């Protein structure tokens, strides 16, 4: 995933994109056969990325249902995974990213959805749901909330000043130490997403991003260690505002974050021009899911909330706000035209062909990536 203005777009050319492969409280009781809990029936506990719903999304649900939504935030998929795999999280709805979602399903972390309580599933694009069914057979445990890409967001003027003739269409922009050293003067931020970023470095090195050997990971570590002195921050929650304010000039992040940053800069009338690129070497495609933890205190309310989010007007408002594509048909008339036609949100066909989906890591590989990432984060 991702974070806070209206959730963006539906899927323009969605089917074609997917064919080619183109990122708290409440009492806890045991599940009944129906999957419902005996928690506070007037409450829903939501665990989500920051900046990942429209300003009125939750308030409108509360007004419509009388259910109070308690929101908590996570900043990495690893943090979410630790909570749901440990159990007794107290959450009713969470937003995992595939392929973390696949591993969590296998571990028994989620309730099967009661689709009789989700009539708005008919509004979703079958091609998108078929794509994520590779991780969740029959879409039994989750609903697509948003999808998008990893890439590089940049402040056009600041980058041009710091690095004339910058290779904007290549990962060399941030993974080459000579370039990173020049850009350090205006600020580089990296997404705190170990498995994703490691795969992007592998792609940059011309290696298979989903079949890394121990030597491949050593090569990734070498790349990251050389650029670490020039990376100002490694934080998934700051890039939107930092880019909009001109506090940083380059960020490795999610596409929708830069749509939001661009919008905020425009609202502020500060003259900041924010661009986004999917590097020529290729990049990651991600899906964020709505799911219900197996021990959710308020599973009935969770179904109500997920169904509400799949209402066409609700999800369109979210998409228009957060700058990410949703699981509806891109032809939806409810989307802002600027979103539906935005190449940052819906990549052109030539860019679609360069996108790949992250496979699930073995426990051994996951531990190796975590160790590598911790070295990167703690080194200066």
Predicted regions and their residues:
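Mature extracytoplasmic/periplasmic domains
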Residues: 293-354
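Early extracytoplasmic/lumenal segment of secretory-pathway proteins
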Residues: 22-25, 30-107, 241
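Hinge/lid segment of periplasmic solute-binding proteins
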Residues: 38, 102-149, 166-175
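Short beta-strand->loop
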Residues: 111-122, 172, 268-284, 293-296
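Ligand-binding pocket segment of bilobal, Venus flytrap-like solute-binding proteins
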Residues: 189-201, 205-277
């Amino acid at each position: 995933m991702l974070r806070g203005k209206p959730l963006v777009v539906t899927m323009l050319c969605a089917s074609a994109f997917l064919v080619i492969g183109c990122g708290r409280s409440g009492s806890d009781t045991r599940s009944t056969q129906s999957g419902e809990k005996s928690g506070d029936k007037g409450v829903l506990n939501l665990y989500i990325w920051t900046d990942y719903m429209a300003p009125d999304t939750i308030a409108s649900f509360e007004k419509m249902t009388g259910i109070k939504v308690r929101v908590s935030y996570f900043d990495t998929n690893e943090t979410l995974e630790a909570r749901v795999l440990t159990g007794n999280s107290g959450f009713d709805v969470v937003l995992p990213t595939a392929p973390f979602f696949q591993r969590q399903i296998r571990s028994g972390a989620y309730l099967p959805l009661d689709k009789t309580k989700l009539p708005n599933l008919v509004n979703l694009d079958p091609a998108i749901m078929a794509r994520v069914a590779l991780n969740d057979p029959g879409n039994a445990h989750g609903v697509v909330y948003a999808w998008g890409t990893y890439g590089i967001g940049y402040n056009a003027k600041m980058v041009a000043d710091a690095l004339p003739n910058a290779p904007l269409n290549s990962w060399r922009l941030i993974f080459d130490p000579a370039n990173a050293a020049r850009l350090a003067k205006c600020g580089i931020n990296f997404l705190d997403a170990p498995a994703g970023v490691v795969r992007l470095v592998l792609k940059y090195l011309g290696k298979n991003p989903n079949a890394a050997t121990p030597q491949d990971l050593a090569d990734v570590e070498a790349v990251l260690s050389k650029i670490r002195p020039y990376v100002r921050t490694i934080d998934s929650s700051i890039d939107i505002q930092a880019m909009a304010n001109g506090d940083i000039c380059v960020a490795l992040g999610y596409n929708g974050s830069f749509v939001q940053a661009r919008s905020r800069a425009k609202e502020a009338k500060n003259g900041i021009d924010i661009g986004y690129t999917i590097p020529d070497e290729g990049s990651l495609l991600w899906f964020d899911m709505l799911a219900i933890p197996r021990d959710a205190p308020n599973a009935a309310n969770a179904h109500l909330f997920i169904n509400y989010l799949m209402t066409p007007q609700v999800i369109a408002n979210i998409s228009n706000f957060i700058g990410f594509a949703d699981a509806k048909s891109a032809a939806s008339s409810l989307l802002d035209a600027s979103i539906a036609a935005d190449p940052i949100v819906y990549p052109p066909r030539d860019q679609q062909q360069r996108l790949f989906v992250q496979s699930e890591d073995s426990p051994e590989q996951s531990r190796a990536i975590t160790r590598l990432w911790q070295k990167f984060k703690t080194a200066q």
